[in-house]
């Protein structure tokens, strides 16, 4: 098991924008924030490189709005979408924390606003996955 915090602004990986240059199709990220986020994730995760099936837990800590002041933040239902945050982060982990994101067989992901004074980023925990772990997760989630 390994856990770490990636400080920065988590960036969602959306669709790519395509254009033609010199007769070739070029695909570009729709947001310029994705590349710096993936690089920050790769830098922090460098040297972990796990083999086999993996369970991932991630908590994305997003910026507070000015209107929140020091009040407790409500559950975050605004953009960015949690699946797009996960996609960009998994790409940053590929080749540094694991060989390929196909190794991820289960995950728990949370998106929330930062507490007052808390930095934005992502708490990431990677654990070896087992059949027993998956059975416990399924049993807990679906009360089987």
What do these predicted regions represent?
Residues 1-144:
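Acidic, proline/glycine-enriched N-terminal capping motif
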